[in-house]
Amino acid sequence: MIKSELVQIIASRNPHLFQRDVVNIVGAVFDEITNALAEGNRVELRGFGAFSVKNRPARSGRNPRTGETVDVEEKWVPFFKTGKKLRDRLNGAV
């Protein structure tokens, strides 16, 4: 599913909302999650999961095409940990 499909589903389930309003709401939610992560904060959505950032330290890597050793810089990456309700639903529990 892509963002536009999510917007269409939410708009169809909420006919009292205009699609442009749903686009703005979904965009605002994603923006706030992104802003919180950029500030180093954790975003927890109970029952769904938690977004956080983790540090990947610098390391030596290898170019698969040439075999040459390259230095990979330290970086921060997004991380998602599923919540219990989501995990249970995916595994068939009710």
Swiss-Prot record:
Keywords: DNA recombination, DNA-binding, Transcription, Transcription regulation, Translation regulation. InterPro entries: Hist_DNA-bd (IPR000119), Histone-like_DNA-bd_CS (IPR020816), IHF-like_DNA-bd_dom_sf (IPR010992), IHF_beta (IPR005685). One of its GO terms (molecular function) is structural constituent of chromatin. It comes from the Bacteria. Pfam families: Bac_DNA_binding. One of its GO terms (cellular component) is cytosol. One of its GO terms (biological process) is regulation of translation. Belongs to the bacterial histone-like protein family. PANTHER family: DNA-BINDING PROTEIN HU, INTEGRATION HOST FACTOR SUBUNIT BETA. This protein is one of the two subunits of integration host factor, a specific DNA-binding protein that functions in genetic recombination as well as in transcriptional and translational control. This is Integration host factor subunit beta.
